[in-house]
Amino acid sequence: MKDILPEEMQIRDYVQQVIKETYRSFGFTPIETPCMENIANLSSKQGGENEKLIFKVMKRGEKLKIDEAKSESDLVDFGMRYDLTVPLVRFYSNNANDLPSPFKALQMGSVWRADRPQRGRYRQFMQCDIDIIGEPSNLAEIELILATTTTIGKLGFKNFEIRINERRILKAMAAYSGFAEEDFDTVFIILDKMDKIGADGVAKELEEEGYAKESVEKYMALFEGVKNADNGLKYLARTLEGYLEEEVEKNLLEIIDSVEAAKTASFEMVFDPTLVRGMSYYTGTIFEISMPELGAACGGGGRYDKMVGRFTGQDVPACGFSIGFERIILLLMESGFTVPMQRPKVAYLVEKGYPTDKLGEVIKQAQQERTAGKQVLVVRMNKNKKFQKEKLTAEGYK
């Protein structure tokens, strides 16, 4: 958690404005949910590793009976949201009758995770999500990717990648290699480390986990085959015949081709069979923004068709994309980014002992300029007026 100084706040406000305006142009509607959710909603085995990072809120008043508590559930009833997806699903379930279908939601707000702080990652951070609920076709993925990449492009980023994969491909690869279905999650957790430990490291960890060497070798050979193939997706579709539904290849190719044909930003769509995404609620397509400047993901998302049904008892197709807002801000700050001048900025420096009647004239003039659309600052003149003027000039004031 950190304090935000004026210089950074100005950039954050600008970025939020660009995000909101762009997403609204794609038909997304802003909504807001509380920062706290019922602990049962947050700890339902849908949030993956994030469920271990919940800031939990103790019961209060008469409900808090410490002496009688036998487990954590007797002490805790709420938690700070760790993402915006779980609250959105609860929101949709409660208000579905009053919402259009499909529903295109835009959310921007703080989330909290009791994580180890690192570069571009904090315990309290802003998330910017767009989701489409009620659209079963891949039109949802296409719209989400185009809206997000258009936004990233407007912020000045180029030559980034959208890595894309499918949960059904991950499962088919594991089944083809001989892993039992109950072991898939463990296999995927290890595979998710590929960027950090490499193929040899993944193979070693799988063997250390006790899996058969034959299965591990067969599994790793698939990734080598993708690497050497002219078209990795088509290679897997052929190799995994009988394990992978035919529609999966067609679905991904439609998404990739449609986005490539319509994109306005400078980026590439890349099929990546090592992409896992940590959330267990994903059911189909998954995708991630890869920034060369950061050397890490800068946002991601995917399809979660089974999650709404956990609240309503009836599955509703859903898909979402989240921008890594804090990492975007970090990159802009480090690059020396300055907010484009949106309106003129004028500063009036008032000397000590300035006559009251003349001060009134200055205030009146300032008000007139504000009415005309200018940003006007009225401040007392410092002793070191040269330094003061230099600082104001650096901030864009005239």
Locations of regions flagged by a protein language model:
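Auxiliary tRNA-acceptor-end handling modules of aminoacyl-tRNA synthetases
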Residues: M1-R12, I66
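Positively charged, Gly/Ser-enriched RNA/tRNA-binding surfaces
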Residues: E8-F26, E37-N38, E72-L75, D83-N97, ...
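A short beta-strand-loop structural module common to alpha/beta enzyme folds
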Residues: T29-C35
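Polyanion/phosphate-binding surface patch
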Residues: C35-F78
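Short secondary-structure capping/turn micro-motifs that flank functional sites
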Residues: I39-A40, R168-I169, I190, K385-K386
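Short low-complexity, flexible loop/linker segments enriched in glycine and/or proline
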Residues: K45-E49, Y176-G178, T285, L392-A394
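Acidic, His- and aromatic-enriched active-site or binding-groove loops in soluble protein domains
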Residues: N50-I66, G178-V202, M291
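Short, surface-exposed recognition loops or helix-turn segments adjacent to catalytic cores
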Residues: N159-I169, V187, V270-T274
